[in-house]
Amino acid sequence: MLSIAEASSEAHVGSEVSVRGWVYRIRSSGGVTFIVIRDSTGIVQCTAKKNELTPEQYDEISSLGIESSLSLIGTMKKEPRSPTGYEISIHKFTVYQKNDVFPITKDQGEEFLLDNRHLWLRSREFTSILKVRSTIFRSFADFFYDQGYYQVHTPFMVSTAVEGGSTLFKVDFFGEPIFLNQSAQFYLETMIYSLEKVFTIAPSFRAEKSRTRRHLTEYWHAEAEVAWIDNREMMDVEENMIYYIIQRVIEENYDDLKLLGRDPEALRAMKPPFPRVKYSDIIKVANEIGMQLKYGDDLGADEERQITMRYCKPVFVTNYPKELKPFYMPQDPDNPSEVLNHDLLAPEGYGEIIGGSQRIWDYKELMQRIREAGLDESAYYWYIDLRKYGSVPHSGFGLGMDRLAMWIMHLDNIREAIPYPRTIRRTKP
Amino acid sequence: MLSIAEASSEAHVGSEVSVRGWVYRIRSSGGVTFIVIRDSTGIVQCTAKKNELTPEQYDEISSLGIESSLSLIGTMKKEPRSPTGYEISIHKFTVYQKNDVFPITKDQGEEFLLDNRHLWLRSREFTSILKVRSTIFRSFADFFYDQGYYQVHTPFMVSTAVEGGSTLFKVDFFGEPIFLNQSAQFYLETMIYSLEKVFTIAPSFRAEKSRTRRHLTEYWHAEAEVAWIDNREMMDVEENMIYYIIQRVIEENYDDLKLLGRDPEALRAMKPPFPRVKYSDIIKVANEIGMQLKYGDDLGADEERQITMRYCKPVFVTNYPKELKPFYMPQDPDNPSEVLNHDLLAPEGYGEIIGGSQRIWDYKELMQRIREAGLDESAYYWYIDLRKYGSVPHSGFGLGMDRLAMWIMHLDNIREAIPYPRTIRRTKP
Ligand SMILES: [Mg+2]
Ligand SMILES: [Mg+2]
């Protein structure tokens, strides 16, 4: 048995090949049935001829509906009029399952398609999306492994919240309330004392009521923490990581990008260094293009969209006002009202994909910020301990993998970047 | 700046080196302070001499407690009496943080150590455990990527349970109840029609009240589904995968295994093929060694421990009685009271690490089993659809990554195999 991509090559022309898959298109005309078969590697046109099969066989194969499954044996030929330039002339076949009508056709509503996501995933678009996504996950991990990072794992059911309590999902843990984690960061920080450079790729959960095109209630979060490096060095790592992923996707999924309408060359042009712009300068840029933003305003989805439409490369926004960022980000010694942070905004209107910063490593500074934030010190005992015993300077970041995938593939909605999106209105299938 | 492993080499003997890390041991004697420093790569003994430093410097470095953090510059020498054969003679140093007393010392109770897991992880044993774990995760994924599998992602908040409802954690989803997923299997099955060969590595959640040494309420679950293959071929893939992981761990973590007291050569001997024993024969074996088991009894932790003490390789147990296994496993045509399944039991008393099977792909057969099991058909509409539209034969498995790690490292308790174990009695830190 060959994959369709393997079979569709010069080497097999004139030979008998066996392939299997699903009916992608079918039509009959003048005693010949043309069936386009798809598998995970591609499509190929096959022909069944009335005068070469028994009447029962010809009837069986001619009556297959879209997405019927079958295997077949036939002769591979060159055929310039077929969609791929190859064609298989069928001698024998076995039907695994005959469908009459496949539920997904053109012109169906969004809700119907979401209810039938398990079938919709078979489209060529989704197949390409899933392949690109797989490359993105693999290459993220490879980038860090190859630089001596270790992959680690942090808990999901937690009692301490990294980013505050309003967007936490509550779980009934044998009768006690507990929360689903929103970030691995604090736990990753505990592991730099053993391993120095760590990353994790895991789901995070946010009970956000947002219905924007870039929010999910569960999403894949890739996070890293690194001992001994500062905010600038962290940005150096990240821009190289993003470009490494882009290059791998172009190399391994060129045709998938094309099929999705994403120009691989536009991506290839997004080479580091990425611009690094202070928050205060981004506010100026925003006002120059007619937005009404003042210093101290946060950048939401809308603002980021308008701003990043101006950029053709990802852009780091640094030095946010302290009030807009969490307690663990250190103040900039040159301007204590700002913190040593960086958000990475994807260009072309996509907006935030990474949030990162240097982390406060001084015990007194951390305790002051915890008190200012009004947090319960006892819940953070283990996080505070890290600054009491052998604390070292360090930085880290969190990357929204689904957002990265959405931007790399230039998709319209984050729901298209993940097989089974979970939003405030959607938990099935 | 060099890592301790890089600095501790012939090439640097006689040269000035810079290293940094944490105090692992310290003692003073006759005007010399011996400090063993550790970083993520290893340890090295350093000496500070009273007559080569200022009195303030000598006092500062001599008074550092365990786990204090520092960087230092000094001359690398060979020193047969040091723990690694190398020694650095300190010229200059910078203390990042001085500790007086590190909370973790010898002879501390289990609960204290679990409460201070964030500090306990710095031990050399845990550092090695975390490194081996990282290799296991990387090599699992590499094995499948290299065979053309795609990594995919499935949802966590679900309304359909794979293995029944009694051990589900309930989440408050904006006021509605929803459950944490226990297995990606059904969702993986939906993706074989696009990609044919898929895997995922993700947390699974089980509200089991067991307090055995091999259960966690959240654990890392690696699952795969593969179109067109049967139960036997699935076992072939799995035994090769297990052996690939073992080989990578031996190659990349030989010293870690030694430090943990696991003999790498005992692991290396566990070459495929692994024995494949029918459930009915395992019951006979159990009774021969004095256990009181009858056909139809399930194998729990205790039974698997006793049975696998007899094996020095992993063993597949196939052909379970239908009643002991879930509805989606097909009956063996040669014996319809048994199913085409396989559990992989790790030897040396460890027991089940994989559960897998062929999956029912015939629509009528599936519907009959769903009805026999008394399940709500409407909740499974999307799973049933897979047998209505282009169904194909397929098989899959789920592997408990923490259990695999526990067995590979020969650990006593699964809690030692994961940084932050979650059990019925433990949700912090
Ligand atoms: Mg933002
Ligand atoms: Mg069992």
From Swiss-Prot, chains A, B:
Q: Enumerate the CDD domains for this protein.
A: AsnRS_cyto_like_N, AsxRS_core
A cellular component term, taken from the record's GO annotations: cytoplasm
Q: Where in the cell is it found?
A: Cytoplasm
Please name the InterPro entries in this protein's record. Answer: Aa-tRNA-synt_II, aa-tRNA-synth_II, aa-tRNA-synth_II/BPL/LPL, Asn-tRNA-ligase, Asp/Asn-tRNA-synth_IIb, NA-bd_OB-fold, NA-bd_OB_tRNA
Keyword Plastid, does the record have it? Answer: no
Q: What class of enzyme is it?
A: ligase
Catalytic activity, as annotated? tRNA(Asn) + L-asparagine + ATP = L-asparaginyl-tRNA(Asn) + AMP + diphosphate + H(+)
Keywords on record: Aminoacyl-tRNA synthetase, ATP-binding, Cytoplasm, Ligase, Nucleotide-binding, Protein biosynthesis
Q: What Enzyme Commission number(s) appear in the record? A: 6.1.1.22
Tell me the GO BP annotations in alphabetical order.
Answer: asparaginyl-tRNA aminoacylation
Tell me the domain of life.
Archaea
Example of a GO MF term: asparagine-tRNA ligase activity
**Which family is this sequence assigned to?**
Belongs to the class-II aminoacyl-tRNA synthetase family.
Give the protein name, as stated in the record.
Asparagine--tRNA ligase
UniProt source species? Thermoplasma volcanium (strain ATCC 51530 / DSM 4299 / JCM 9571 / NBRC 15438 / GSS1)
Taxonomy, top ranks, is: Archaea, Methanobacteriati, Thermoplasmatota, Thermoplasmata, Thermoplasmatales
